[in-house]
Amino acid sequence: MVLFIISSNAYALEPGKWSFVQEDEYCYIGSLATETDLPENKIRGDNYILVYRIIGSNQNIVQIEAGYNYNTEKNILVKIDNTDFDFYTVEDSPDSAWTDDDNKVIYAMKKGLSLIITGESSRGTITNDSYSLNGFTAAFNDLMNECK
């Protein structure tokens, strides 16, 4: 597992838009949440979702960044339209989450309209982040065609 941490400002990720970025060793597509229900008195860092690929690899990996440390004892729920997927986090990078079903998640993202991530912080705060999947398929096609 490779951990990618980017600044959403550095690569101009936008809410509701899927952006393609190519670097020397990897490429990714990403988006910011269109809506989040974090309580007003809580603070968090950048939160976004990526699909990345190492150049020369044929593996596409879905990664979520929460902007806070997840509760490592609980799964993160990703709901794409009416289908649920479990993501997990690890102690070495508690603000990130992955799945063992990347291809299934990507397939659902290509077919879906919306994605909602429900996670619990290490302090017990539950968040729901909503993402639009409009434009995901076009961005994913760029990833597949340009990142070889």
Q: Which residues does each PLM region occupy?
A:
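N-terminal signal peptide c-region/cleavage motif recognized by signal peptidases
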Residues: 5-9
